[in-house]
Amino acid sequence: MTQQEMKKIAAQAALQFVKPDTIVGVGSGSTVNCFIDALASMKDQIKGAVAASKASEERLRAIGIEVFNANEVSELDVYIDGADEITPQGAMIKGGGAALTREKIVSSLAKKFVCIVDGSKQVDVLGTTFPLPVEVIPMARSYVARQLVALGGSPEYREGVVTDNGNVILDVHNFHIIEPLKMEHTINNIAGVVTNGIFAQRYANVTIVGTPEGAKIIE
């Protein structure tokens, strides 16, 4: 079974967490694209969605789902998104698609975060397989990079990428993130950092893993 097929299995299983007459929080990325496609079957049952990226917004509108601005809603029932890495405790690294800041905002509005992944994203310690993305205001890039080196990381500028907010991304290698919540706060306190891709303060309440045997739900 291909990775794409396992993503589709996880995405399909996430529909059970979507309640009728609610506004759904939707993340971004390849697994979320599978979820948006699956959500088309419920488009007449939900009020609409809040999207964490322009790409997701366009995909939702294309299938006829109304998209609301995050400022128009006070709370979301559920937020569905993927992850680049996720631990058994639900802490994640996200931001491979450079939408981490908006993902953090929309997920913070939700009562429940449902993370949909294939098995390759499961790790015991964050930073094992994937660098940590950090969104940075352009003028602070060099300063922030030096601070990340001081923390033990090896930052790499993601060439040619500008976020939906007009900022740049540093991908930090060689972090072995034993205390995700502490590291999330430490990096966010560096002047010029918008946010980083550790999702530990807003962790996943439910993880759905697509496997060849079907969807495995971890709560």
From Swiss-Prot:
Claim: Isomerase is one of the keywords in the record: yes
Annotated residues for binding of substrate: 28-31, 81-84, 94-97, 121
Cellular component annotations (GO), alphabetically ordered: cytosol
Coiled-coil residue spans: none
Pathway listed: Carbohydrate degradation; pentose phosphate pathway; D-ribose 5-phosphate from D-ribulose 5-phosphate (non-oxidative stage): step 1/1
Class of enzymatic activity (EC top level): isomerase
SUPFAM superfamilies: D-ribose-5-phosphate isomerase (RpiA), lid domain (SSF75445), NagB/RpiA/CoA transferase-like (SSF100950)
EC number: 5.3.1.6
Record key words, sorted: Isomerase
Annotated HAMAP family: Rib_5P_isom_A
Subunit (UniProt): Homodimer.
Function statement: Catalyzes the reversible conversion of ribose-5-phosphate to ribulose 5-phosphate.
Family: Belongs to the ribose 5-phosphate isomerase family.
Protein name as catalogued: Ribose-5-phosphate isomerase A
Organism: Actinobacillus pleuropneumoniae serotype 5b (strain L20)
